[in-house]
Amino acid sequence: MRIVVLAGGTSTERDVSISSGLLVSAALREKGHHVVLLDVFTGYEKDIFDVDELFKQNYSFTDSASVGDTISDIDEVRENRRDKTNRYLGENVIDICANADITFFALHGGEGENGKLQATFDLLGLKYTGSGYLGSALAMNKGLTKSVLIQNKVLTPRGEIFNSPEEAADWKIFPCVVKPCSGGSSVGITIVETQEDFKNSVREAFSYGETEIVVEQYVKGREFSVGVVGGKALPPIEIIPKTGFYDYKTKYQAGAATEVCPADITHEQDGIMRSAAEKTYEALHLESYARVDFILDKGNNAYCLEANTLPGMTPTSLLPQEAAVEGIGYADLCELIIKNSLEKYNR
């Protein structure tokens, strides 16, 4: 097949996305596919080119990525764009994707994951991997996610949505968790113990360009993630941070957390989380693949924290680790995601 892998973009998770895109591209090429790796934001900045040659050459906009403990410098990315515009889709992206059998979204956060890009591709009749615009929009907004989970009787921590720091000022439940409403990779998320720290955390959450934040009760317990591929849950993986909680730095720095899969849990606990993950996947109208995060307390209550419609595919990412336990190698997982995604177009 001819496949475009879209990565990069302008979200705070840009570097993670590029790392995912490079690995996905390499894996699909190993499987014999012709793959073009594009930065969704900068695109392919040439006025005259041969699309067929791009696929034959397995063109890639970069051959390296570095995921550090800080987020990407998006202003620098925008400054280096040839046309100097702020449009999300870079030059020639749509034209090249239109010449592919399918586009693999190796994007994380922002317009690549919030349903806007999915809706654009739907309108243009272009095939892509992952959830559609509805599921993407619901899962990207943590406030909407919480509302849908409550309506579908999926356990989730008690929380509220606030539109300004002033609105949040009356929150009295501590410890609590403060989250940007639409961020990913735990960027801007803080666990708060006191009212004074709460004010600072709220300001930080709003500093990421958010118009809403979610504040929820902190649930003490073990942290797990459950991948769902084709509607079926994979084995839960336990995340044990060496310090603090599972934030951006811990997620993408090798050795910052211990990740155990298969997890040291009972058959009952395994079933509780797999069932909740599949129920979340269905309630949020997710498709092809996703990852659902949980806190499991001492009473075996699995609290759903969020769903990720475009899980990371980096060397330290959770979904590939879970798939490996089921005997699904990395390249096979990439092909399975494409197979599951194509099925919705053949219905």
Give the positions of each predicted feature.
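ATP-binding N-terminal substructure of ATP-dependent carboxylate-amine bond-forming enzymes
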Residues: 1-134, 138-140, 144, 163-168, ...
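Active-site nucleotide/adenylate-binding loops and adjacent lid/helix of ATP-dependent enzymes
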Residues: 3-7, 11, 15, 19-22, ...
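Hydrophobic beta-strand scaffold residues
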Residues: 35, 127-128, 156, 176, ...
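Phosphate-binding site of ATP-dependent enzymes
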Residues: 193-275, 296-303
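Conserved metal-phosphate-binding beta-hairpin within the catalytic cores
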Residues: 217, 226-228, 281-313, 323
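Active-site "cap" helix and flanking loop/linker of ATP-utilizing ligase/carboxylase catalytic domains
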Residues: 238-290, 321-347
